[in-house]
């Protein structure tokens, strides 16, 4: 069990949130890689390869969305005991940290929804698979103009998420190495 600080808050995040954090991090980086890879495949690529990338990209995207919702529910339930932002951070660092975390959470919810909307609105869609559940229903009307809008939102939001993830990781490394650890070293709270 994680130890409590003097004010009754946890020193480390609960193990469930730590696992969700790292699983989502791996999945998000994998999805960004697979998105780049699958959209860059040459025209003469075998259909099985296209299907492998697109089906897995879709179902792991849905999984990231579900994990983000679970993460938010757990955070909400534990909001009064989760570790606080370290006092040693400068005001701009606290603000940046809060903004980056909230944007990462927002984008891990929106990007899969944009991806789902792409598949749902695309006139030649082969569905939205989700592991053992089967195909998710496509709720939007088929409209290739809407598909183009959702595709742009999905792509540019993914680039923004990648930039935020890099900034998030850079902040953790900065506090660990440049600040020489101490009170502002937030990495141990997630390990």
Regions of interest found by a model, annotated:
Residues 1-191:
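Membrane-embedded alpha-helical bundles that constitute the cytochrome b-like, heme-associated redox core
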């Amino acid at each position: 069990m994680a130890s409590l600080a003097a004010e009754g808050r946890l020193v480390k995040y609960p193990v469930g949130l730590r696992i969700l954090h790292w699983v989502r991090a791996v999945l998000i980086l994998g999805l960004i890689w697979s998105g780049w890879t699958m959209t860059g495949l040459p025209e003469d690529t075998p259909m099985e390869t296209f299907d492998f990338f697109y089906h897995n990209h879709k179902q792991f995207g849905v999984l990231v969305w579900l994990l983000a919702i679970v993460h938010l529910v757990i955070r909400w339930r534990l909001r009064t005991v989760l570790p606080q932002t370290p006092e040693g951070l400068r005001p701009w660092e606290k603000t940046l940290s809060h903004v980056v975390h909230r944007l990462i959470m927002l984008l891990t919810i929106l990007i899969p929804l944009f991806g789902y909307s792409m598949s749902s609105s695309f006139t030649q869609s082969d569905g939205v698979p989700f592991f053992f559940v089967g195909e998710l229903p496509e709720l939007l009307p088929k409209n290739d103009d809407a598909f183009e809008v959702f595709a742009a939102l999905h792509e540019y939001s993914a680039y923004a998420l990648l930039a935020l993830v890099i900034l998030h990781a850079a902040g953790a490394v900065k506090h660990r190495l440049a600040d020489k650890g101490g009170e502002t070293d937030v990495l141990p709270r997630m390990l």
